[in-house]
């Protein structure tokens, strides 16, 4: 008998800082997306894959936070990339924060409901709700906003009810002729992209609000010197000289510390010693 496969793709949508990246990391039980308190940390769509057995493949796509101001400022580039996904995905996760409903949430709902896809209202950060008695009235309020497929309260941070969300989606997967991705993959990111994200996370962690939104990290080379050691060369691109000074710091102290944090994280990821070279350049400058 021919093997049956079940697959489905869910796009994770919401305003900035509602915990989208934390949720995708929990859903696939692996850290592939940067988590930070800084708004607009996620710069592009990131795909995570959760394989259950050898038949079920749950695909999740983390997206940059949506806000009216950010969509306008970026001339819709990242926004268009996110909306382009809507034609090929099966489910939409609208991520909401605790028991609030804002104009931004309304704005996003009005955008995504036009695509006529099943929308799940995911109430995140329930670990921060002091009294769970406030949840039921909020769920009733949400049910009047739209005919949501499901309204599911979760905590991306603690993992509460993540298994319920995963199970609900698993039960709604469709039969497909073959898996979308190989069953040994957790993400569609290549190794250089993962390294770049690890470095960018440490820059965000250390520099915080000092860090320009426009920063980009590109991994140029990963060279295995031997079984126990690798050399990694990465470039941090910024818009202007002032941004370059912020990242480098006085006598190079900031970039050295960021490099040390990134190196330790990379050594943990690769389980080997890492020699990390970081260069900070202005965009459009060739090395």
UniProtKB/Swiss-Prot annotation:
CDD domains on file: Era (cd04163), KH-II_Era (cd22534)
Q: Which GO terms describe its molecular function?
A: GTP binding; GTPase activity; ribosomal small subunit binding; small ribosomal subunit rRNA binding
Keyword check for Cell division, yes or no.
Answer: no
Q: How does it sit in the membrane?
A: Peripheral membrane protein
Map out region (G2) in residue numbers: 40-44
Keyword set, alphabetical order:
Cell membrane, Cytoplasm, GTP-binding, Membrane, Nucleotide-binding, Ribosome biogenesis, RNA-binding, rRNA-binding
Q: One cellular component GO annotation, for this chain's record? A: cytosol
The transmembrane segments are none
Region of interest (G1), residue spans: 14-21
GO biological process assignments: ribosomal small subunit assembly
- According to the record, the residues making up region (G4) are 124-127
The residues listed in the UniProt record as binding GTP, with positions renumbered to this chain, are 14-21, 62-66, 124-127
Query: Which Gene3D superfamilies does the UniProt record give?
Result: 3.30.300.20, P-loop containing nucleotide triphosphate hydrolases
Under the heading Pfam families, the entry gives: KH_2 (PF07650), MMR_HSR1 (PF01926)
Question: Where's the KH type-2 domain?
Answer: 207-282
Q: Which family does it belong to?
A: Belongs to the TRAFAC class TrmE-Era-EngA-EngB-Septin-like GTPase superfamily. Era GTPase family.
What is this protein called in UniProt?
A: GTPase Era
Q: Which organism is it from?
A: Buchnera aphidicola subsp. Baizongia pistaciae (strain Bp)
């Amino acid at each position: 008998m021919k093997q049956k496969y079940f697959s489905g793709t869910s796009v994770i949508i919401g305003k900035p800082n509602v915990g989208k990246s934390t949720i995708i990391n929990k859903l696939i039980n692996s850290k592939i997306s940067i988590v930070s308190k800084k708004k607009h940390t996620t710069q592009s769509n990131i795909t995570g894959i959760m394989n259950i057995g050898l038949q079920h493949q749950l695909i999740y796509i983390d997206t940059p936070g949506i806000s009216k101001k950010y969509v306008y400022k970026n001339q819709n580039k990242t926004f268009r990339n996110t909306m382009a996904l809507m034609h090929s995905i099966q489910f939409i996760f609208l991520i909401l924060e605790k028991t609030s409903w804002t104009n931004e949430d309304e704005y996003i709902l009005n955008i995504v409901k036009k695509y006529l896809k099943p929308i799940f209202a995911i109430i995140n950060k329930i670990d921060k709700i002091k009294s769970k008695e406030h949840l039921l009235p909020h769920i009733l309020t949400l049910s009047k906003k739209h005919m949501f497929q499901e309204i599911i309260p979760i905590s991306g941070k603690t993992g509460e009810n993540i298994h319920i969300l995963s199970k609900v989606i698993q039960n709604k997967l469709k039969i497909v002729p073959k898996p979308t991705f190989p069953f040994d993959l957790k993400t569609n990111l290549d190794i250089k992209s993962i390294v770049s994200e690890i470095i960018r996370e440490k820059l965000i962690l250390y520099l915080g609000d000092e860090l320009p939104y426009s920063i980009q990290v590109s991994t140029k080379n990963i060279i295995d010197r031997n079984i126990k050691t690798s050399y990694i060369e990465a470039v941090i691109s910024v818009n202007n000289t002032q941004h370059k000074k912020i990242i480098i710091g006085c006598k190079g102290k900031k970039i050295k510390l960021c490099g040390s944090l990134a190196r330790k994280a990379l050594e943990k990821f690769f389980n080997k010693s890492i020699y990390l070279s970081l260069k900070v350049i202005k965009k459009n400058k060739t090395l």
